[in-house]
Each structure stands twice: as C-alpha cells, then as structure tokens.
A protein has these predicted regions:
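OB-fold single-stranded nucleic acid-binding module
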Residues: 84-87, 209, 229-234
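An acidic-aromatic substrate-binding cleft motif
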Residues: 233-270
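Short Pro-Gly-centered flexible turn/kink motifs
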Residues: 209-228
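Short, surface-exposed, low-complexity cationic segments
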Residues: 72, 225-237
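Short acidic, Pro/Gly- and aromatic-enriched capping/linker segments at domain boundaries
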Residues: 192-212
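Polysaccharide-binding surfaces and accessory modules of carbohydrate-active proteins
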Residues: 1-189, 205
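Conserved, mostly hydrophobic/aromatic
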Residues: 72, 214, 260
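Active-site beta-loop-alpha junctions enriched in small/polar residues
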Residues: 179, 224, 263-265
Length: 270
C-alpha cells in the first residue's frame, strides 16, 4: 500500500475530484525494504519506471504525544521534465468499512474558523458529511473534504481533522502545518478509511511545478497520530506534541499550564 499520493497530467472530471488513485502515484512500485532507524523513524522508497519519478516517504516520531511527522519528497530521476500538480502523504487502512457498523460508529471532528468565531468544533457522523451510507465494498467515490485557499490558512477551517471510531474506541488525527493553501480529505479505499492531507495543488491553489531531471519537490509538513479514546484524547496528544515542538526547553508547562489569548477573544482586535 502506498503511503503517499503524487499526480501529474491528471484528467479533471467531476468524479475524479477526490485526490487519491491518480497516476503515477497509483502504479509506483516500492524499492527495497523500508529503512528503520532506532525504532523511531521509517523510510519508504518508490519508483515509477515510465516517468523516472522517485518518491521518498519518511515517518518519524515527533518526540511528545502519539504523533508522527510525515515527509514526502519526489525527485525526477528520468531524462525528461515532469510537471507535478499534487504531492502529499496519505494514511491508508485506518478503520474498517467491511461491516455496516461504520455508518453509526464513524464520527468526523472538524473546526470551522473565522476571526470573530474561532475554533468552532463540530462532531458529525461521517455518513452525514460526504461519505455515502450506501457504500458496499471496494473503493468509494464519495469523501469528506476541507480546503482553504491563500495565505490565511485558517480563514474557513482549522487545518485539522479527527476521525473517531466509536465502535473500536480509537481515533486517528491529522494536522497540516502550513500557512498557504491546503486540503484535507477523508475517504474509503479497499474497505478502509484513509486520511489524505495536502498543500496547494492544481485543483486547490493553482499550483504545479515542472521538475527537470535531478530536481526535487517536497510536500507540506504534516503531523498524524492514533490513540485510544475519542476527541478529548486525540486533542490531548496533539497538545503534548505542540507544546514540545513550540517550546522544547520551556518549563512553563508545569508552572503555567494555561495559555490565554486575549487578542481577538477579549479585545476584539482593538
């Protein structure tokens, strides 16, 4: 199973608006065995013979919290230029769709966001937010999606999503760490859910880049994790990760555990 998605020259039709399943990402073959470093980092390599594109995917422990960093880089190892209009990690095989229980058990948590109404979190059944409840088996063409255009990356939604399986008692969560255009897609493939976080693409952001032989392009930074429990447990793991990442040497977490932001919430920006 590929743990990335890359695309070039894709046909853009309505039923192909989901980001997964395009060439050459769909047909790339793995190169060698995954490389594991100290039990905290794993690297996968893929190659497409037709285009000469090579993709390197690295997952590594973030240090605090049940969170992984995902890095994806595509390099043109061929002899001709190749234009890339989508590159991103993808987290497949998350929760089973084989039984009909997912219709009542799978919840999606997401946050609408504007300047005067920040972090408005919603808890919805995923079948009510884009995923077809009549899905039977195999791949589903329906999906849940958030997106943002431009440099105000939280203008409509926070670049985060939590997929909660209440039947299994676990949650998967993902955060895009980027200040430009992005999209977050949750769908079904091979009887399981996937999460696909992405930076700007040709469809979302009018972005593409032509790679000459030897040139590379990297995906936007992404954090991903899985934990037992629901929304609160997922947010707790992301909070541990953020505090350790933003303030790695600060002892204020023990002495000052609350961060109070009065910019918009109290002073109305005055």
């Amino acid at each position: 199973t590929n743990v990335f998605q890359t695309r070039h020259g894709a046909c853009e039709t309505i039923h192909q608006m989901r980001a997964i399943g395009f060439e050459p990402g769909y047909s790339m073959a793995s190169v060698g065995a995954p490389r594991i470093v100290a039990g905290k980092q794993i690297t996968f390599k893929y190659r497409d013979k037709a285009t000469g594109l090579q993709v390197v995917v690295t997952w590594k422990c973030a240090g605090k919290g049940a969170v992984l960093h995902a890095d994806v880089t595509v390099t043109n190892r061929g002899s001709e230029p190749v234009t890339i209009d989508h590159i991103s990690p993808v987290f497949p095989g998350l929760c089973s769709m084989k039984s009909g229980d997912w219709v009542k058990n799978m919840h999606i948590h997401f946050a609408r966001n504007v300047w005067n109404a920040e972090a408005q979190w919603y808890d919805r059944l995923i079948c009510e937010e884009g995923m077809n409840a009549q899905y039977l088996s195999g791949d589903s063409s329906s999906f849940f999606r958030l997106e943002s255009l431009g440099s105000f990356s939280a203008s409509r939604h926070l670049p985060m999503v939590i997929l909660e399986d209440r039947g299994a008692g676990k949650s998967c969560y993902c955060e895009i760490r980027y200040s430009g255009s992005w999209s977050m897609e949750v769908g079904g493939r091979r009887n399981r859910f996937y999460i696909l976080p992405s930076g700007p693409t040709k469809t979302d952001g009018q972005f593409w880049q032509t790679l000459a032989p030897g040139e590379s392009l990297s995906a936007v930074p992404v954090a991903f994790g899985v934990t037992n429990g629901g929304f609160n447990e997922a947010i707790a793991e992301l909070t541990k990760y953020r505090r350790a990442d933003l303030r790695p040497t600060c002892k204020a977490d023990r002495e000052l555990p609350v961060i109070f932001d009065d910019y918009m919430n109290c002073l109305l920006g005055n």
